[in-house]
Amino acid sequence: MREKLTVIKVGGKIVEEEATLLQLLNDFAAISGHKVLVHGGGRSATKIAAQLGIESKMVNGRRITDAETLKVVTMVYGGLVNKNIVAGLQARGVNALGLTGADMNVIRSVKRPVKEVDYGFVGDVEKVDASLLADLIHKGVVPVMAPLTHDGQGNMLNTNADTIAGETAKALSVLFDVTLVYCFEKKGVLRDENDDDSVIPEITRAEFEQYVADGVIQGGMIPKLENSFEAINRSEEHTSELQSHA
């Protein structure tokens, strides 16, 4: 029987507001067994960029990352947000290690080719070093992964945190019995974003595409669900469970 591993993805105000961050740290520290935390930080990046006079541009919930924006997200994701989480977990007895994809070459990406939209310095994950992560995990280390990767040519790349969580879970599912949990700020996927009781309890890929076409699902929820379906499709043989928790 394979060892169990929990991969948790959090973002938004969960990691960027003091009250919800404290709750996250306490809840994550209480999870028993092997675990990995993947975080976002887009709100902080947008805030810092504005303070520096850098405009943030989004298309379908995805950030356009020009050269100046890349500097901001590298500082914010790999520094401010990541180290706040790591320090908080260390204070709770969790042997957390903050990582970007460039650290120990743990996640290699390729720069997204220009199609309809030029996303700039954005990476599509090419390889996750599951053996390295498993090594760390078996030594009692808890990886805390920032949404940054690299191309192996000296360039950092902004990479969607939901994608990193899904690809990490997929890679580790070869070695562990993986549960992947996406934590949303809301109760779940909503038919009406202003009504927290309008949760869609289950959703198929076809229904998702129709909801997007109808404008029911929009913005940052689109890449979250795209990556959820991708994780299911590509990890079917190994990933035991895919959940979304508020």
Tell me the role of every PLM-derived stretch:
Residues 1-240:
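Nucleotide/pyrophosphate-binding catalytic subdomain
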Residues 241-246:
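Positively charged, low-complexity/disordered segments
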